[in-house]
C-alpha cells in the first residue's frame, strides 16, 4: 500500500478528520510565509512543488538560515532602538530609547557575518549599514539575477529616485510571481525581523537581486 492510499484509507475510516487537515495546512502555511488560513489554494499547492531549476549558492542559503534564526528580533523601547538593534549596529547596549539609526542593512550584514563564521569562510566584500552600498558590494563579487532564489539579496530604491536611500533583505523563495523575503526595519515601531510577501508585478522600485558566487567567499568550506 502506498502512503497516499494509506492516508485515503485513514480518512475513510474517520481517523483523520477534516479539522486535522485544516490545522496541518495552517502549520505548513505558517512555516512557508503564507497566510495561515487553512485553505489549500493555488499558492499553498505551489509551495509543495517549488521550482528546482535555479542553482542556489550554499553561502546564500547559510545567510538565509541566519536570517530565519533572527525572526522576531528587533526594536524595543523606541524606534530603531533596543539591544538587538544596537548590537547589529556595532553599539554597546545603553538602555536608552534613542534612535540609533536605520538597521535593515545592518541586519543583512549581521546575517552575512554569521554565515561566514558558521561556514569558516572569509567574505570577499565589505558589509555596510547602507542598503544600496551593501547591495553594490555583494554584486561586485556576485552576480545579478532576474529570477531570484533562496539566499539571494534583494534591494529596493527609497526616497527620491536614484538617491542613496534604499532598503534590503534576503530572499526566502520565489514562486508563482510572488517574492517571499525576510527583512528587518520595515514598518512602524516596533519593527521586527519578519517575513514579507510581494507580487513582483507591482514592485516598481526594485534595484535588483544579487546572488552570491564562489568569488563572494574564500576559505576551507567555500
Q: Would you name each region that the model predicts?
A:
Residues 1-50:
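Short acidic, glycine/serine/threonine-rich helix-capping segments at coil-helix boundaries
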Residues 200-222:
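Low-complexity, Gly/Ser/Thr/Pro-rich intrinsically disordered linker/tail segments
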Residues 25, 108, 151:
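Terminal peptide-recognition signature
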Residues 36-40, 74-85, 119-128:
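Surface-exposed patches in mature extracellular/periplasmic domains of secreted proteins
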Residues 187-197:
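Catalytic alpha/beta core of large soluble enzyme barrels
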Residues 58-61, 118-189:
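...with weaker cross-activation on analogous glycine-rich loops/strands in unrelated enzymes
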Residues 13-21, 40, 55-59, 96-104, ...:
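Extracytoplasmic/periplasmic, Sec-exported soluble proteins
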Residues 45-117, 221:
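N-terminal capping segments
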Amino acid at each position: 500500500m502506498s502512503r497516499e492510499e494509506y492516508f485515503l484509507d485513514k480518512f475513510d475510516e474517520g481517523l483523520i478528520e477534516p479539522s486535522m487537515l485544516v490545522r496541518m495546512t495552517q502549520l505548513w502555511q505558517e512555516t512557508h510565509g503564507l497566510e495561515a488560513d487553512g485553505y489549500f489554494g493555488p499558492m499553498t499547492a505551489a509551495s509543495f512543488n517549488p521550482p528546482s531549476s535555479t542553482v542556489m549558492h550554499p553561502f546564500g542559503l547559510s545567510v538565509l538560515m541566519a536570517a530565519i534564526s533572527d525572526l522576531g528580533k528587533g526594536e524595543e523601547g523606541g524606534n530603531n532602538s533596543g539591544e538587538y538593534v544596537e548590537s547589529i549596529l556595532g553599539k554597546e547596549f545603553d538602555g536608552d530609547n534613542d534612535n540609533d539609526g536605520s538597521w535593515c542593512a545592518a541586519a543583512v550584514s549581521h546575517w552575512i557575518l554569521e554565515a561566514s563564521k558558521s561556514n569558516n569562510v572569509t567574505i570577499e566584500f565589505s558589509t555596510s549599514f547602507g542598503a544600496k552600498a551593501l547591495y553594490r558590494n555583494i554584486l561586485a563579487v556576485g552576480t545579478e539575477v532576474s529570477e531570484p532564489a533562496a539566499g539571494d539579496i534583494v534591494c529596493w530604491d527609497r526616497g527620491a529616485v536614484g538617491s542613496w536611500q534604499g532598503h534590503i533583505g534576503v530572499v526566502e523563495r520565489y514562486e508563482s510571481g510572488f517574492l517571499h523575503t525576510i527583512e528587518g526595519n520595515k514598518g512602524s515601531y516596533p519593527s521586527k525581523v519578519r517575513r514579507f510577501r510581494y507580487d513582483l508585478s507591482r514592485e516598481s522600485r526594485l534595484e535588483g537581486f544579487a546572488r552570491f558566487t564562489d568569488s563572494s567567499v574564500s576559505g576551507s568550506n567555500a
